[in-house]
Amino acid sequence: VVASVAMLITCLDMPFIASIPVFGIGMIGIAFQVSFFQAVILAKVRKPGASIISSLVLGLFHVVFAPQMILFAFIGGLVGEVLGLLIFRSYKSYLSIGFTSCFLVPVITLCFVALYFMLMSPAKAMDHLQLTNAGWIIPTCVTLGVVALSIAGATCGTLLMRTLYKKGVLHESL
């Protein structure tokens, strides 16, 4: 519940960021927070499906800004969940938690937002992705920024939970 409320509070800057017409700029605004809270949730609830459920909660908060975001959040959580469980087989290690947590926002940004615009209106997509005006520099920089912030958020969330478990504030529920 606390993580859900915190995700809602951290998304309050989205109306201001959404008015900037740059591909993925909204994802830069939420990449750190979403990955951080995803790592906190996965460290507390170490069960398969936790990433998908928390992604759906995230999508419910973002459906106000764009109705397709709940679908993108679900797919991003599913991709992270499947890759994390295929590689690590469980969420027992903090590396698996961090790995799974950093996939949600980049998958949404890199793949599905661009694909959505390409399918809905190819001409509008070229303008939205700034492929006609600024070349490939702006989408590439934004994408790298989103990936870096997602990794930083997942790392911070994982380190916070590890510290809380070591200090005895939280008890591991494996």
Functional labels for PLM-detected ranges:
Residues 1, 28-32, 48-56, 70-75, ...:
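Hydrophobic alpha-helical transmembrane segments
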Residues 1-49:
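Hydrophobic transmembrane alpha-helices
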Residues 3-12, 57-66, 102-112:
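Aromatic-anchored segments of alpha-helical transmembrane domains
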Residues 14-23, 57-84:
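Interfacial aromatic-anchored transmembrane helix boundaries in multi-pass membrane proteins
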Residues 20, 70, 95-173:
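Membrane-embedded alpha-helical hairpins and interfacial helices in multi-pass inner-membrane proteins
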Residues 37-38, 75, 156:
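Hydrophobic/aromatic residues in alpha-helical transmembrane segments
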Residues 42, 86-95:
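Membrane-interface helix-boundary motifs at transmembrane edges
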Residues 43-44, 81, 85, 162:
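Transmembrane helix-loop junction
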